[in-house]
């Protein structure tokens, strides 16, 4: 029997928590992907402690009950859908323009790297896993075997 897997993206905290909690619509990367479909979000063991002290990040984390000390690490946090991947075509200090014509501003802009040439991955439909799945992360998109813990019944829809 063929074993199916789910694509997983590892992210440093606090970025993983902010994405999963719906504080930003996009995850920015220096590379594009043609993949569209189910995706799991993995919080790596690393925490960017400086970013956690920066406003508005500190307040957004606090709104969701997090501090730099209690962010979950080394776990798959949630599943979602990777719906699109847009290239950043222009940016200044407060906004960016994506190749789809969308203008990114506010917290979405502050929570990503919108350097021209980078890519904004549009991700939606988050389901928080209960409990989180402890696993070592990897670079790029990687596969995790689908098991009961990734089934819809063991998740809570958060946005």
Regions found by a protein language model. Give the residues of each.
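Structured alpha/beta reader/binder surfaces that contact nucleic acids or chromatin modification marks
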Residues: 2-159
């Amino acid at each position: 029997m063929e074993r199916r897997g789910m694509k997983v993206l590892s992210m440093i905290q606090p970025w993983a928590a902010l994405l999963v909690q719906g504080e930003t619509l996009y995850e920015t990367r220096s590379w594009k992907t043609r993949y569209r479909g189910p995706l799991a979000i993995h919080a790596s063991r690393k925490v960017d402690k400086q970013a956690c002290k920066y406003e508005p990040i500190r307040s957004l984390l606090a709104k969701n009950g997090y501090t730099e000390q209690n962010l979950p690490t080394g776990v798959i946090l949630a599943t979602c859908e990777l719906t699109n991947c847009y290239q950043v075509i222009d940016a200044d200090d407060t906004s960016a323009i994506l190749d789809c014509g969308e203008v990114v501003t506010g917290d979405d802009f502050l929570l990503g790297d919108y350097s021209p040439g980078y890519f904004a991955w549009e991700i939606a439909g988050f389901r928080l896993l209960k409990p989180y799945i402890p696993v070592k992360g990897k670079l790029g998109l990687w596969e995790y075997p689908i098991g009961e813990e990734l089934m819809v019944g063991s998740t809570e829809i958060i946005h």
